[in-house]
Amino acid sequence: MDYNKLRNIGISAHIDSGKTTLTERILFYCNKIHAIHEVKGKDGVGATMDSMELERERGITIASAATHVEWKDFPINIIDTPGHVDFTIEVERSLRVLDGAILVLDSVAGVQSQSITVDRQLKRYSVPRLAFVNKCDKTGANPYNVKDQLRSKLDLNSVLMQIPIGLEDKHIGVIDLVLMKAYYFEGKDGTEIIEKEIPSELLEEAKNKREMMLDALADFNDELMELHMEGKEVPIEIIYNAIRTGTLALKLCPVFMGSAYKNKGVQLLLDAVTRFLPSPHDIKNTALDLNNNEKEIDLKIDNNLPTVALAFKLEDGQYGQLTYVRIYQGTLKKGQELINSRTSKKFKVGRLIRMHANNTEDIEFGGSGDIVALFGIECASGDTFCDPSINYSMTSMFIPDPVISLSVKPKDKKSADNMAKALGRFTKEDPTFKTYVDIESNETIIQGMGELHLGVYIERMKREFKAEVETGMPQVAYRETITGKAEFNYTHKKQSGGAGQFGRVAGFMEPLNKEGETYEFVNLIKGGVIPTEYIPSCDKGFQKAMEKGTLIGFPIVDIKITINDGQYHIVDSSDIAFQLAAIGAFREAYEKAKPTILEPIMKVTLEGPTEFQGNMFGLLNQRRGIITGSLEDGSFSKVEAEVPLSEMFGFSTVLRSSTQGKAEFSMEFLKYGKVPSAIFDELRKKFNDQNKS
């Protein structure tokens, strides 16, 4: 394989923009499947990439299946990513291993809330992208509007590479502005590409749009700029070089268009992927050297260097755990010995395969830059595998904290065993899915990113693991904090025969207003009134006290603690004595520091026909929502608001019924905010009643 020609790409989009349909067409044109199936298939087959039973039924892509195709002797690994906010960890994970992406947009709806989330993730991982404006055959299609929205809403330098020949039901092809030719897609499934001269009625528009394209590209190539300014013809290769340079520098987003469903424009998009998106050689990747204070190391696409690979996705296959791996340096071969840098355990590579949606192809070897899968390796998602001669770790992926929890109870003994297996599997697969047993209620609690996220796992428990479970009401992950400053001076003393316990801790607590930090410990002890070896004990005690607040039993956050005095006893003082003194000191001051309750606030985006805008405002106002923005775009409206998570349970059902099923919403965690006094009293009462019972 020529690794200069390799492309690792993701297809990212808002839900229902036609992303899986586009992938399906790509598989078809690259001869990976022999018939095209629709997403919510009338033929009962479902799209090839949606291999989980649940995905085919719901018509949403949940797990990002990886597939390998070849287009005009360019090998391409495609990661199909989910478009639903509740599954963003899948998206984040895929982006971590990609070199380039196609951002799919609906030509009517344009840039939607999830497109914004996905774009933010693409920016976080510096992924170059092309835009594909899909569904140009839909009523109300306006690719020019979408191109403008890419600029206004996503701040992308979007430049048209094509213009449509006809829109809505008259959409029959596209004009390539670089080659100045018209392309039509004919024959069964659009396999015959017919190149013709541009229709006379579109020639003027094509010339104008080409001028605009060349103006935009002049920034990326001096030769192009000179020729263009002198009014000379610019060679095609120079135009292609400028587009590639701008795209790789993340300063240009080339815009292509068509209709995947109607088989228009997909092959030209594939040409663009090979021409303008990066090969692994074009991207800089780094690892941390764990033997050298996590020093950053540049990795090189070189088969002769020691192997470094990242496990980015786990799945249960029929032959055990299937681990998807991106090779960043060196090679993977059957029988090769590697080490997992997180666990320091050595293992041998067994079966090595290339994936096509859910079919496998055995291979002997994977080279630098490639994406392959391994069978039967024990690991967690995000682990780094490397040659035993080095100890590198790929920088860890950003993992958001869960915002919702749910109690799950197995219906019988068999279900209990199966549920335990399922939970073990899911927590390894998905770092945003967490589980624990509540000590007081003895219930198993699962936590995740939203109702749909947890709902899918409960369904999977039933289907894949035959675990019948009952679920409780969803619970919000509240937090407690303080709003004032309070002093403490606490002595812990215990004498009960033998060695006693003694420790005194004094100081104060105050609110911590530091972005991204929830606790700070400051040691101002002088003169050894608390010996140095017991300072960490105090720190540990304070952190222990913060695990469970006294208001409603949730963790305490955003506190700065300063200790400035204390006392010890030469015999009775110990690590545990100072831990307990700190816990007592914390509780003494906490009551005086005006504690309050915080709740997760979500950024909620509603989108639907303008006729329902009033209903959308009403629904948000009823839920303590603060409207932060609204946009009317002809017949289409979008409303953005900040709404407490506790008010959003069951919202999808309410929204459907009040907008005739025509509006949709997405939400993601934004911040924690103080609860109003009425809610504060309600939560306190509920907590106290539970404690009494």
Swiss-Prot record:
Q: What is its main location?
A: cytoplasm
**Which Pfam families does the entry mention?**
EFG_C (PF00679), EFG_III (PF14492), EFG_IV (PF03764), GTP_EFTU (PF00009), GTP_EFTU_D2 (PF03144)
Keywords for this protein: Cytoplasm, Elongation factor, GTP-binding, Nucleotide-binding, Protein biosynthesis
Query: Where does it sit, as one GO cellular component term?
Result: cytoplasm
List the SUPFAM superfamilies: EF-G C-terminal domain-like (SSF54980), P-loop containing nucleoside triphosphate hydrolases (SSF52540), Ribosomal protein S5 domain 2-like (SSF54211), Translation proteins (SSF50447)
Q: Per its UniProt entry, which superkingdom is the organism in?
A: Bacteria
Domain (tr-type G) spans 4-281
Lipoprotein is among the record's keywords: no
Give binding positions for GTP: 13-20, 80-84, 134-137
What GO molecular-function term can you cite, just one?
GTPase activity
Location(s), subcellular: Cytoplasm
InterPro entries, per the entry: EFG_II, EFG_III, EFG_III/V, EFG_IV, EFG_V-like, EFTu-like_2, G_TR_CS, P-loop_NTPase
Family membership, please give it: Belongs to the TRAFAC class translation factor GTPase superfamily. Classic translation factor GTPase family. EF-G/EF-2 subfamily.
Q: PANTHER family, per this entry?
A: ELONGATION FACTOR G, MITOCHONDRIAL
HAMAP family attached here?
A: EF_G_EF_2_B
This molecule's function is given as: Catalyzes the GTP-dependent ribosomal translocation step during translation elongation. During this step, the ribosome changes from the pre-translocational (PRE) to the post-translocational (POST) state as the newly formed A-site-bound peptidyl-tRNA and P-site-bound deacylated tRNA move to the P and E sites, respectively. Catalyzes the coordinated movement of the two tRNA molecules, the mRNA and conformational changes in the ribosome.
Name the UniProt record assigns to this protein: Elongation factor G 1
Upper classification of the organism: Bacteria, Pseudomonadati, Spirochaetota, Spirochaetia, Spirochaetales
